[in-house]
Amino acid sequence: MNEQLKQINIHLHAMIGSIEYVQRWWLSPNISFQLRCPQEVWDSGVEGRDEVEAFVMQAAYGGGA
């Protein structure tokens, strides 16, 4: 697992509270990604990875995204 993904998962776990729910989050359609799953956005390339990271960090530190 790369460091960027590791940090995202750490933040998600802190917000969501369970590894199982973090795994579900990655595979669930998300309105912030035009109903695409975060995993699909992540897998689309560097821009997708940055988009997912920005979303999670905004939710963690800057309020709801």
Where are the language model's segments positioned?
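Non-transmembrane "mature" sequence context
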Residues: M1-A65
